Amino acid sequence: MKTAHEIRPGNVIMLDGSPWVVQKTETTRSGRNAAIVKLKLKHVLLDSGTEQTFKGEDKMDVIVLERLDCTYSYFADPMYVFMDADYNQYDVEADNLGDAAAYIIDGMEETCQVTFYEGKAISVELPTHIVREVIYTEPSARGDTSGKVMKPATITGGGTVTVADFVKVGDKIEIDTRTGEFKKRA
């Protein structure tokens, strides 16, 4: 049993007797109240999705499923194909990747963990930190140095990340895949 606050994207939880893949988590805190955790979920067996809200201390069953270390191979619409060390290929639907799809690129060297439920690949968990190149961002605003200045940047793979003002096109940056936050220049 894990608390709702400990749940991460890629986890599979049991709700009302059915397995659900967590695609996104969002935690909000208020001054007097406990943390509220909003989970974006996709049913493992059906193609339905939902959003559920829990208190941070709510307990839920996390299913321990088979996981394999795999590398990204190619995209065959609407499937992402991953390959293990024995050259077995596994198809994962694009919908099952959630926000992780923005970080998956051709030639990706990072190893991902593919999760299986009843023999079917249902989700992919990326490494905690990945390095991607900035392909577009606005130039820095001259003289705007008060506080922590951030701006949007498009990275290889098409995802958008909020980066520090000093980041330029062509820079390689480190991103935390759990939160989608810029960490540092690589």
Curated annotation (Swiss-Prot):
GO terms for molecular function: translation elongation factor activity. SUPFAM superfamilies: Nucleic acid-binding proteins (SSF50249), Translation proteins SH3-like domain (SSF50104). GO terms for cellular component: cytoplasm. Gene3D superfamilies: 2.30.30.30, Nucleic acid-binding proteins. Keywords: Cytoplasm, Elongation factor, Protein biosynthesis. The keyword Protein biosynthesis applies. Pathway: Protein biosynthesis; polypeptide chain elongation. It holds the Pfam family EFP_N. It is found in: Cytoplasm. Its main location: cytoplasm. GO terms for biological process: peptide biosynthetic process. It comes from the Bacteria. The keyword Protein biosynthesis applies. Involved in peptide bond synthesis. Stimulates efficient translation and peptide-bond synthesis on native or reconstituted 70S ribosomes in vitro. Probably functions indirectly by altering the affinity of the ribosome for aminoacyl-tRNA, thus increasing their reactivity as acceptors for peptidyl transferase. NCBIfam families: efp (TIGR00038), PRK00529.1 (NF001810). Belongs to the elongation factor P family. This is Elongation factor P.
